[in-house]
Amino acid sequence: MSVQLSMVGLVVGDMARSLAFYRRLGLDIPADADDRPHVEVRMANGVTLFWDTAFAKAYDPNREPPSGGYRMLPEFFLADRGAVDATYATLTGRGYRGHRAPFETAFGAYMAMVDDPDGNTVLITAG
């Protein structure tokens, strides 16, 4: 049996606010998507990233939002270190919380961490 990652979903409180963050990160999200309860973007690698304001309410009525610590760590790869620095500066300059400024990891990757509007820490990586 072969298992493959097909989709990653983010439950969001405010679709427009969340999509604005991910557009600034560099994702190509349709401009008319801000008022939708569910938005999907298929990435170049075939994985679909989706945002949803209604799924949890409709299919898991007893769901309680998680608290404390990482809920998940979506990671986005950029072309090079300069792109990581520029994207981090753009996002934090727009008021998004910089979780950790760009740094080199022990395994040679260059990354930064920024919190999206729903509290998910997003990794921005090159290398």
Q: Which positions does each model-derived feature cover?
A:
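Conserved active-site tyrosine of GNAT-family acetyltransferases
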Residues: 18-23, 91, 119
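Short glycine-/small-residue motifs
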Residues: 121-124
